[in-house]
Design a protein with these regions (language model features):
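Cytosolic juxtamembrane N-terminal segment immediately preceding the first transmembrane helix
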Residues: 1-77, 90
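C-terminal transmembrane bundle
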Residues: 74-75, 104-107, 111, 118, ...
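Glycine-rich segments within core transmembrane alpha-helices of 12-TM secondary carriers
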Residues: 186-216, 220-223, 227-232, 236, ...
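Short hydrophobic/alpha-helical segments at membrane-entry points of transmembrane helices
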Residues: 151-160, 221-222, 325, 429-434
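Extracytoplasmic
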Residues: 58-96, 170, 174, 337-344
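Conserved MFS/SLC helix-loop-helix module at the cytosolic interface between two early adjacent transmembrane helices
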Residues: 112-153
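Central mid-sequence intracellular linker of multi-pass
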Residues: 2-11, 15-17, 50-57, 187, ...
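Cytoplasmic helix-loop-helix junction between adjacent transmembrane helices
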Residues: 159-198
Length: 540
């Protein structure tokens, strides 16, 4: 039982249990330039087109393109109108709820087409989905420009919904693309950056959009974002090759003998260890030229049909780990993001009386909180590596979970202090509110990073579908709350809303305790289920 994790006493290979720190029993495995970190997953030995074998600069450029476009197409559109929600209701002559629905319907589209994007990515690769998303995101912005210039709510709503078509692929596939590009020990910081695009950058967008709306008018927001859309589209075409790869299954072995450093009485670990099989009997495949990598499609990556793949997505809901990530990441992020629907409603009235620009500057707190939360990735790597060393070089995916404690502390600090602040209104109370919003942002980003890494480590082959489910739940919640949260806040008060957020958040984070203890048992159980039952064997 390594550090409270219940062991299953089974020698069969298991994803998420790996030799990560070199010892004598792993001496045949490639490492990182002589350092004692073993490469997980093992790269191809006969195909230089494996993304894991790309030059470092090429992988970093691909990641930078993912990161930039995640901001431009996924993070930017939603909060763009948040600071001016209250003011736009008067400008367009519609209720505040209808202004919130400009974002709500957009996010409903994102969630609704998520399964289709997932199966198309599995079948034809991620690049076609990214290209489609970049094109539709740009077209949606153009339609929003037309609608805003005409003060036409319906045209503006249509543009926002088309922007939603351009959001789905970036929000749902970027995290699994990180798993395509990087080894296990390289993912922490990059995963934290990807989480930050959804928790941190919306805040800086709100800050900038509030100031721009106050100075230049709300129509300028869409005009200013169009050049960034075009740059993102060009970057997708020329800098983001296909990251999906059909890697030949490595030859696996289970380790029946204890590593030499282990004590005689130690329990025998179950390991997923890759041996190099020596020189391959097949000739090495030719490296693709740059022009070949620009092709919109590069073939198919599975022999399954679209309907078959579509039906498989929801099978993953039988996995307790999937339910867990939906709770500690999907729901928590949704609660934080929908708070943007009501902040303008809170601060635009006495005793605060903030204007549109000042409503935007309120998000400075959450921006700083999200920025500081990028340490969650390296911290998660450090804790996992430390526990791995103490565990005789054997990595368990559950070593990602302990930093959830930090998330729980800051989430509680943020929401419950925010509750007290709005229940005791003062003219400068928005300053404490900004701090609370930042603390909540930090507290939510940490568990989201840890949960994302846990899924990439434990269920790498199913990560695309799992992140799609997470994205669907999150965006359906966004839409659902947009239909009633403004009226709920007006009736029961913002303090009641934030108290509810705090209680729900702590209850959901508490599920990390059984996941840490029984996570390995669950991984073994799901591995057995995948092997035994046909429907699960198909998704595995």
């Amino acid at each position: 039982m390594p550090f409270g994790i219940i062991d299953t006493r089974n020698d069969a290979p298991l994803a998420g249990t790996e030799y990560l720190i070199r010892d004598d029993s792993a001496s045949s495995l490639p490492d990182v330039d002589g350092i004692d970190t073993i490469l997980v997953p093992q790269p191809s030995d006969d195909d230089p087109n494996d993304p894991l074998l790309w030059p470092t600069w090429k992988r970093e450029i691909a990641f930078a393109t993912l990161f930039f476009n995640n901001i431009i197409f996924a993070a930017l559109p939603g909060p763009m109108l948040a600071p001016s929600t209250f003011a736009l209701a008067g400008i367009l002559g519609v209720p505040v709820t209808m202004i919130s629905e400009l974002s709500g319907y957009q996010l409903l589209i994102v969630g609704a087409i998520g399964p289709l994007v997932s199966v198309l990515a599995q079948k034809y690769g991620k690049r076609p989905q990214f290209l489609f998303a970049a094109v539709t995101g740009t077209i949606g912005t153009i339609i929003c420009i037309i609608g805003s210039q005409r003060y036409n709510y319906n045209t503006l709503l249509a543009g926002r919904m088309i922007q939603g078509l351009g959001t789905t692929a970036w929000e749902s596939l970027s995290m699994s693309a990180v798993g395509d590009l990087l080894y296990l020990h390289e993912r922490g910081l990059r995963t934290a950056f990807m989480v930050a695009t959804l928790t941190c950058t919306p805040s800086i967008v709100s800050i900038i959009s509030g100031a721009m709306t106050q100075a230049c008018g709300w129509q300028s927001l869409f005009v200013a974002s169009l050049p960034f859309n075009i740059v993102g589209l060009i970057g997708t075409i020329f800098l983001l090759p296909e990251t999906q790869f059909r890697r030949s299954p490595p030859r696996l072995r289970s380790v029946s003998e204890k590593p030499v450093e282990m004590a005689q009485g130690a329990e025998k670990p179950e390991l997923s260890v890759v041996e190099m099989a020596g020189p391959t009997s097949q000739p090495q495949k030719p490296r693709q030229t740059y022009l070949q990598t620009l092709a919109p499609m590069s073939g198919t990556y599975t022999d399954k049909g679209i309907l078959h793949l579509l039906s498989e997505i929801f099978v993953h809901l039988a996995n307790p780990a999937v339910i867990w990530i939906l709770l500690v990441s999907g729901v928590l992020i949704a609660l934080f993001v929908v708070s943007a629907y009501i902040t303008s409603q809170i601060w635009s009235v006495p005793p605060y009386n903030l204007n549109i620009a000042q409503n935007g500057f309120f998000y400075t707190g959450s921006f700083l909180g999200g920025l500081l939360a990028t340490v969650a990735g390296p911290l998660c790597d450090w804790t996992a590596r430390t526990l791995t060393r103490l565990n005789h070089g054997i990595f368990e995916a559950e070593f990602r979970i302990p930093i959830m404690i930090i998330g729980a502390v800051f989430t509680a600090l943020g929401w419950f202090t925010f509750m007290w602040d709005v229940e005791h209104p003062r003219p400068n109370g928005y300053l404490l509110g900004a701090f609370c919003h930042g603390a909540a942002c930090f507290g939510i980003s940490v568990p989201s990073t840890a949960a994302g890494l846990y899924i990439l480590d434990s269920f790498p082959k199913q990560s695309t579908e799992i992140f799609i489910l997470q994205m669907m739940l999150k965006n359906f919640l966004f839409y659902a709350f947009s239909t009633f949260i403004n009226s709920w806040t007006a009736e029961d008060g913002a303090g009641f809303v934030f108290r509810t957020w705090g209680i729900v958040s702590l209850c959901l984070l508490a599920t990390s305790i059984p996941m840490y203890i029984f996570g390995k048992v669950n991984r073994r159980m799901m591995s057995n289920v995948h092997a035994k039952y046909r429907i699960f064997r198909a998704v595995a």
